[in-house]
Every structure is written in C-alpha cells, then in structure tokens.
C-alpha cells in the first residue's frame, strides 16, 4: 500500500524514546506500514512536539531523561480535550508500573523486548 493512500494515509505517530536503536527500528517498521513518524529523544521534547504536531498516536518510553514517560502521559491526558492514543513501552517488569500507567489512561502497555508485529498490531488497532 502506498504511503499516501488508504486508511493509514496521514496517520502520524510520535515516538518518544532516548534509545537511538529503538527509535530507528520502530521508525523503519512503522514507515514500512505507511505511517508518518515523528521523533523526540526525551520527555520534554516529546511534549513540545505533541503540542505542536498533534499526532494521532504516541509511543512513549517509560524511563527517559528530563521527564519520565509517566509525567509525559499525565501531561498529555490533562492538556488535550480529545486524548491522544498512547502506547507505553518499557523494560520494567513491575506490575505497579503497569497499574499506574493504566490509572493515567494509557491505551496499551508493552514490555521490552517485544516483537515488532505486536507493536504494529497495537498501533493498527488503536488507529482503526
């Protein structure tokens, strides 16, 4: 499917992660599925880009410099009249963190390492 046609056309995803390898692998996979990808390397940059670019979905790492994924998620939920869809990714195994993310309104919570097909499936479900 071409990037400029079909249901994915114009769908923009903001990746917020401080790990360059993860950003690159996610970006390549999502672009291969026809999505436009924006990148932020820390929580503050992620919030600024989200406010300026109004993405359809945010993929958010939990542990980042300057502002954690939790703080970004909380701010996203408070500042937008229509909540943006958010997938939180983390290497953290703790169930308390997942419960807190769910309390803040995360749409999906995926633990690293994960198969790219699992992430793409979540993206497609949330953007359909």
Outline where the language-model segments fall.
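Acidic catalytic/metal-coordinating carboxylates
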Residues: 42-45, 68-72
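Charged docking surfaces used in two-component/phosphorelay signaling
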Residues: 24-32
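Active-site beta3 strand of CheY-like receiver
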Residues: 53-59
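The short loop immediately C-terminal to the conserved phospho-acceptor aspartate in CheY-like receiver
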Residues: 19, 62-63
């Amino acid at each position: 499917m071409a990037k400029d046609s079909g249901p994915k056309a114009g769908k923009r995803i903001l990746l917020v992660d401080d790990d360059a390898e993860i950003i690159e692998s996610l970006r390549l996979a999502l672009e291969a599925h026809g999505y436009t990808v924006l990148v932020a390397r820390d929580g503050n940059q992620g919030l600024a880009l989200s406010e300026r670019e109004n993405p359809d979905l945010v993929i958010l790492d939990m542990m980042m410099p300057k502002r954690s994924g939790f703080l970004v998620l909380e701010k996203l939920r408070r500042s937008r009249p229509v909540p943006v869809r958010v997938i939180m990714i983390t290497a953290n195994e703790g169930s308390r963190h997942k419960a807190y993310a769910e309390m803040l309104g995360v749409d999906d919570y995926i633990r690293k390492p994960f198969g790219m097909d699992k992430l793409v499936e979540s993206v497609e479900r949330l953007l359909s």
